[in-house]
Curated annotation (Swiss-Prot):
SUPFAM superfamilies: Ribosomal protein S10
Function: Involved in the binding of tRNA to the ribosomes.
Sequence similarity: Belongs to the universal ribosomal protein uS10 family.
Organism: Nostoc sp. (strain PCC 7120 / SAG 25.82 / UTEX 2576)
One CC-aspect GO term: ribosome
InterPro entries the UniProt entry points to: Ribosomal_uS10 (IPR001848), Ribosomal_uS10_CS (IPR018268), Ribosomal_uS10_dom (IPR027486), Ribosomal_uS10_dom_sf (IPR036838)
Name assigned to this protein: Small ribosomal subunit protein uS10
A GO molecular-function annotation: tRNA binding
Amino acid sequence: MATLQQQKIRIRLQAFDRRLLDTSCEKIVDTANRTNATAIGPIPLPTKRKIYCVLRSPHVDKDSREHFETRTHRRIIDIYQPSSKTIDALMKLDLPSGVDIEVKL
């Protein structure tokens, strides 16, 4: 039995600001739906927390420390049956600079 391989675009988004990430996901899904492609997502992935421990004093006091953290929020969007219109619309889409985008065909 031969099965047809479905064409798929996987878009992976990362950002430090969750609200900025969600608005970017909405723009991508709306663009895909306008060009008659099927968009599944955004699928939230686990948030990565990176904690930095810094001494508060420039001197010897090792008891006084301060913690800082960065949170990286991630989402995945799958677009099935993309046409050339879909790819052109996604290329022309204006997204904020705080969002890291990775596209796989």
